[in-house]
Amino acid sequence: MHARLKFTLATMLMTLPFSSSTRADDPPAAPVAATNAPGALAPNGYSSGEATHVRLVAIVQSANSEGRSRARIERIATSRRGTAIEVIVLGEQDSTKKQPAMLLVGGMDGVDLASTEQVLAALNTLQRDHAELLKTMRIYAIAEANPDARADAINSHTPRATNAREVDDDRDGAIDEDAPRDINGDGLITSMRRVAPAGRSATHVVDAADARITRAAKKDKGEVATHELFVEGLDIDGDGLLSEDALGGVALDHNFAHRYPEFAVDAGPYQMSEPEAMGIARFVRDHSDIVSAIVFGRHDTLVNFPDTKDKDSTSRTPMCYLAEDHDMYRAMAKLFKESTKLEKSDSADLAGSLVLWLANHRGIAAVAVNGWTRPLAPDLAEGAPAAVETGDADEAAWLAVSDRLYGGAGFDAWTTEQHPKLGVVEVGGFLPFFKSCPTIAQAETLAVATTPFVAKLAELTPRITVSDARLTPISNGLVRIDLRVTNTGTLATTTEMGRITQMIPPIVLRVIGNPSDVLSGKAIEKIERLEAGASNEYSWTVRVQDGASVQITVIGPNFDTITRTAAPASSATQPGTEAPR
């Protein structure tokens, strides 16, 4: 199967199992119950672009009400179609005042539309209910990282993982000329199947227990494939392939540098080739105050913790998280489950993802949140026939959800159509978005569930305190100076991976004066990493004039400069104080 067709099946139409139109000899489907369905299927109710900007403006206005100045919107990049990619800065607005910060990102694609709702809900709750937290912690939030994909998905009612880059997927000199097309006129892109004619390779069978399901033949059980399966579309370019040159593009979560999947059709021509990805990368590079990050979307590292300690062929690069950081990430996963009560979540391949780039290239404590999975189907009504056992339990479970929770709205019954190239085909299957994205009502519920975790993770920060500088005379103008630096916070100053990559600036202690007067100890000391609750002790032997004092400064990426003065006993000394956060 062509690479783009595989990609389309895996992402755009990940919502679709496949079956045949009902015939008289088919076993009856489970009875459709009149239930309180959780609202219209996605993308109904979702918004993008200008509507998202309006919601961000409302958050800023609320945060800045009553004479406060706690929020602003900045443009950090422009999409390929010219749409602004915006970040909202929530908390202290004086950029010269250094504080720890958390990064929130959503809207990386047009498949998981709920991620933007999760970011916006978190922002609303933080500005409304966590005023004290915002005095000591900044929040940077990007609600729509890939606005073009989100807008296309909503407007076309078809999931789209990629941005608007034009790509000649099938290398025929034409761009995006053979995208999926609506054959039966129902306004949706679903699937087509047909009995494989002579000379073609059949791959699937119609399930004997439930004819709505078309599944791969189980050759180990002697099944013989009878059907071909396609994404709904036409062979516009006459190359014998259907829907293989779809619109776009590059998936942003395959475009980042860590484990960049260079041969994937949706990875882009090179790492961070896309303006959306580069805009995020530059923003992160320019904000070394970021200590933690949550990327909402198709990935999950909290419910399904990636426990692997494997490294790549160099034996240096972790496939997911560095083993030495696992305890920290496990603690975050536990916090997530306790905060949200979510025990199941979908996920996706992390290769080339933003979350792994943040964690392994930037040294930020970064996690991925999805939280969405197949809903539970209500029990069958009393007296209803028991559900039949099919050859594909997962597809049958989704059918049960459609039948019992959505009143059958999740599945488009197969109908016979005359295809201009294939002849007689059946068109139908699960509706786009049904399996990949919650309804807007479900997304709002999910956002309420994940917001407490955002607030609790924001409370996990390093906090540097510096003791008073103690001066002890030795003799002949020589003094000893002692100082202690402590991390009284709940997070290390950087991850162990951050210490290795050295992308997060270290904490720097500097003895002010002529370096040649520092006779023992280093005039400049660096703390690459300080665990939560840990302390470092420092001593210097310094040559001073009679009665003179010595100043030591402590500088870090997420606290204002701290100055301590070591003075003779007759002079006033400053007590140790906590670093501004």
Residue ranges and their predicted role:
Residues 98-99, 113-117, 121-321:
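Active-site/substrate-binding loop(s) of hydrolase catalytic cores
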Residues 485-499:
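Short amphipathic, basic-aromatic surface patches that mediate peripheral association
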Residues 517-545:
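Intrinsically disordered, low-complexity Pro/Gly/Ser/Thr-rich segments with frequent PxxP/GP/PP motifs
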Residues 559-572:
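Edge beta-strands of extracellular beta-sandwich domains
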